[in-house]
Swiss-Prot record:
Transmembrane segments: none
Catalysed reactions, as listed in the record: tRNA(Ala) + L-alanine + ATP = L-alanyl-tRNA(Ala) + AMP + diphosphate
Keyword Ribonucleoprotein: no
SMART domains per record: tRNA_SAD
Keyword Cytoplasm on entry: yes
Protein name, entry field: Alanine--tRNA ligase
Native source species: Pyrococcus furiosus (strain ATCC 43587 / DSM 3638 / JCM 8422 / Vc1)
Gene: alaS
Subcellular location: Cytoplasm
Amino acid sequence: MEFVMKTRMFEEEGWIRKTCKVCGKPFWTLDPDRETCGDPPCDEYQFIGKPGIPKKYTLDEMREKFLSFFEKHEVYPHGRVKRYPVLPRWRDDVLLVGASIMDFQPWVISGEADPPANPLTISQPSIRFTDIDNVGITGRHFTIFEMMAHHAFNYPGKHIYWIDETVELAFEFFTKELKMKPEDITFKENPWAGGGNAGPAFEVLYKGLEVATLVFMQYKKAPANADPSQVVIIKGEKYVPMETKVVDTGYGLERLVWMSQGTPTAYDAVLGYVIEPLKRMAGVEKIDERILMENSRLAGMFDIEDMGDLRYLREQVAKRVGISVEELERLIRPYELIYAIADHTKALTFMLADGVVPSNVKAGYLARLLIRKSIRHLRELGLEVPLAEIVAMHIKELSPTFPEFKEMEDIILEMIELEEKKYAETLRRGSDLVKREIAKLKKKGANEIPLEKLITFYESHGLTPEIVKEIAEKEGVKVHIPDNFYSLVAKEAEKQVEEKEEEVVDFELVKDLPDTRTLYYEDPFMKEFDAKVLKVIEDWVVLDQTAFYPEGGGQPYDTGILVVDGEEVKVTNVQKVGKVILHKVERPELFKEGTIVHGRIDWERRIQHMRHHTGTHVLMGALVRVLGKHVWQAGSQLSTDWARLDITHYKRISDEEIKEIERLANRVVMENRRVRWEWLPRTEADEKYGFRLYQGGVVPGRIIRILNIEDWDVQACGGTHLPSTGLIGPIKILRTERIQDGVERIIFACGEAAVREWQKEREIIKRTSQILRVPPEKLPETAERFFNEWKEARKEVEKLRKELAKLLVYELESKVEKVGEIEFIGEIVEGSMDDLREAANKLRKENRVVVLVNKEGHFVVAVGDKLPYTAGEFAKLITSVAGGGGGGRKELAQGKIRDIEKAKEAIEKVKGSL
């Protein structure tokens, strides 16, 4: 579909719609002589060395200029909204926030939640890995950038503003506030599509640089049964109109600052506080600014992913500045590395401050990718500076604007330091891995490590392709690293597998039923109730109301009894489909629509679930206070006997920390704090409590249920809870586990379950005390004494074993038989498998075969180097006679026979084969 985007301003002020002679795309301009759209590669940068904005701005100044303009606009005042975290806890379909509109997806755009202001303005830190291989090279690409934006949400019956006003606001900001030349601004038409939405759009271009994108989101992906008359085709995909029309704009903060300064690269304009110290530390040779300027001008014409090879860019720049490609590479490479390090460490600062913990999965994987890529760049520069020192520079510079960085500084730096140590260990182990792979390749006659294997080395072992190449080339094996390698692995990490939960029954079967009244929320202590049967679907019964809690939010379903016509029927499962609750029963044939039934839940099971669920929230509050604000819930489950809570954390939890967590949690229990729950509109809840609400994951709906433990923990949670913490009873941490990189599991018990655990421990102590015949308080020192005595005794046993092995060898040497020219020893002996191996190795000579079998059936075969036999052949011969299995190398094999009675026969078989 072609959109002709004629606006009020274009008509009234004499703008001309033209077609770019290079790319063929339509654009609007005030310049009648203009023939190109202003977008690279149609136009080069014209502002480098000649700033396109009269005044020089810093990041803070430009951000404030933008936000103030929209906030204080006379006709369209916008509400100023604080930045959202780069880790989007409110949604589960993306790993990181990559644009300001993502802050408001899906809830605001779908109409399920109100925007925090309408219209609104925001400057949103955004992280994208799609251009990671361009960072440092092109002069303009970042992994972290701020997208300044103004958004308007036009709901049915509530129009805010649309295309005309958006274009006018953008033009007013650029020309009146920033004093850009109107005749140099172009609006290029380029429909936008992404994330399931689409619409017409303008790219705003100035002096060869895209400074803003104005998207008019008004379509959504067409369903299979869409009305053909409503369908439009955008970029090859089918879309239908949305009810809500959204103004989605994005202005590049860093690009506008760069435009105002005219520096050789955007990095020089916004990251000088890191770049300059790194240049000094690395002793980087000062180069002619013209080289950097020409590099940026030409790099602006294409992306590395598009051109395929960085060498092409080098050749073009070298030609322009009149030096060789090799000399250009030598001069410019250190700058590119420093630029990339400065960008990557800034992205890390935001990610770690907002709760990302480096790991092998999801956003943690992307953080680790940045860490290891930065370390690799430092290594290439020959710099020994710790990465944490560079991150500290960002924290110092950015904390006045983002005070949360200072608050999290110690934890951020410790995470980075630990990751550096892990990476050093990875490199130490990695060399052997690569060499083993090279040996396999050489056996197959190959002499190049394929791309898939490079990706595996990186993803599974953390080995960067540059390190693999370094090792491989020493072994005479080639490695080709694609210019877009890191973009490829980042794309793989960002792919989200959409797991569809299997529905208990087809939603179509319950969609016409009324919502089930949730008595378990109205009164969590309700044990019995009456209800009417609305429908029976196979062995599931739907009631008009229920006190049975359905499975969800980490809390298991209730069980119990439904009494129908005097018959007690067991309820074995309770699930929710949409807003309808279904009860699985043992005898569904007894239930008829319209019948009144009496429900009775298993109260002991439910109350223990309530203790554990409320205890989970108390424990979470203690974990955050002891370990730090980077801690987020990564999963939970509970039962009657125990509960588990998975959290993001970058190292093992120490014993001292466990004691403090347990102490704090039990203090909150003893203080008997009030536990309140309330239903709030999503936007109000977000504004009131922030995004820590979503500890338990994404919660759907316009209205969400908030659980609030007085001055301790607030979460969006759909479970059943106790009205005060005192009812939880004692909380006992049973153990912690490292379930995956970056995730700790805490297993704990509350109430009676905790008491049972203490009783078990007391019984163990009592029994141990009786066995050792010492009072409980003397158990540690007694156990230590016994352990030391056992160690000494073990040393003596080992000494004796070695003496016996010597005697065995001496005895067996006297039993050598001659079979032709071959010496043969074959005996059934006393001793362990270790004894057999040691004896066989000592007895092995170049012209000798040794077969030793012990009373348990373990055997060892040793064959001399000069003999034309293999130990493995003899192992197979032995097991063919006496059963069992075994195998080994040419000179030594081992195994175990099944029939010990046939051991002598097997030995004779080997002897007879010589």
